[in-house]
Amino acid sequence: MILYKNVDICDLEPIAKNGILSIDECGNNNWDKGKRAENDTSVVYLFSPIGKQNSFPNYGAALLEVQCEAKENKIGKTDTHVDDYIEYITKRVKPSEIKRVIIPKIFKGYISVPKNIEITWCEFKAERYGNNGLEECSDEIIEQFVKTAQLMDSTDFNFFRGVTEKRTMIDLYNIEYIF
């Protein structure tokens, strides 16, 4: 089955070498204390998007497409993404089961990708709050976002948040990686 997982760009090299490992197996627990749901740390979480939003970069700006066996995991009713995707779990994802690493091509000049990692560069769409609620981001807003946002590591302060020229935050919603 084809499933997806967002990961940090800075973690691509060890993922390419070792696959996607559980927190228990790899020791990479980059969740802020008290901000992680009571999820099992001995499994790998994957997703299948329900709507048009197909990437959840709060977990990392690189989207991995994987083909592996996994079982559906019931998401709690209060989970942030309960209406966004179906969650799956597996013990681990082998490197050979990672089919693509997908990153928006507009990020190219602002990130560092290991030379041995093949990237599928994609288009990028998102929405942000404007005067009339959520509205599609203009090309100018997307460019300003990419120039000013931290994109490599989700533990960085203000990760995946841009700043306008007037110094207000650019927060994106309903993010689509178009590939």
Predicted regions span which residues?
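C-terminal, well-folded lobe of enzymatic/effector domains
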Residues: 100-179
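Short beta-strand element of the conserved SAM-dependent methyltransferase core
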Residues: 4-7, 62-68, 118, 151, ...
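Surface-exposed flexible segments
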Residues: 11-28, 72-89, 110-122
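ADP-ribose/NAD+-binding catalytic cleft of ART/PARP-like enzymes
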Residues: 1-42
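Intrinsically disordered, low-complexity, compositionally biased regions/tails
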Residues: 23, 31, 38, 80, ...
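ADP-ribosyltransferase catalytic core
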Residues: 26-99, 103
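General structural signal for secondary-structure boundaries
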Residues: 7-11, 93-95, 150, 156, ...
